[in-house]
């Protein structure tokens, strides 16, 4: 039962952070930012937010981390939870890793 509650909270955070970033974070207006996933700690105190950017990933990640206080404040006004977790933005590199694995598999196929 606890996992269902945790997943529900992760979904609530994901939906609202995506909206806040796309509509309200001024220094990312010219960049396509996609929130790929959320991982909320079991004690609800920390939240890793996995994102991808259309360009300048490291620079935009810094901008997003600078805006994390503002985003947390906006979340608190929307969600009305007793405690809003600290937000930690991270670049999601799953796509790049999957491409690398595919390339390795193709090389193995060619060798046979």
UniProtKB/Swiss-Prot annotation:
GO terms for molecular function: ribosomal small subunit binding. Keywords: Cytoplasm, Ribosome biogenesis. InterPro entries: KH_dom-like_a/b, RbfA, RbfA_dom_sf, Ribosome-bd_factorA_CS. The keyword Cytoplasm applies. Its main location: cytoplasm. Gene3D superfamilies: 3.30.300.20. The gene is rbfA. This is Ribosome-binding factor A. Belongs to the RbfA family. Pfam families: RBFA. One of its GO terms (biological process) is maturation of SSU-rRNA. Monomer. Binds 30S ribosomal subunits, but not 50S ribosomal subunits or 70S ribosomes. The keyword Cytoplasm applies. One of several proteins that assist in the late maturation steps of the functional core of the 30S ribosomal subunit. Associates with free 30S ribosomal subunits (but not with 30S subunits that are part of 70S ribosomes or polysomes). Required for efficient processing of 16S rRNA. May interact with the 5'-terminal helix region of 16S rRNA. HAMAP family: RbfA. One of its GO terms (cellular component) is cytosol. It is found in: Cytoplasm.
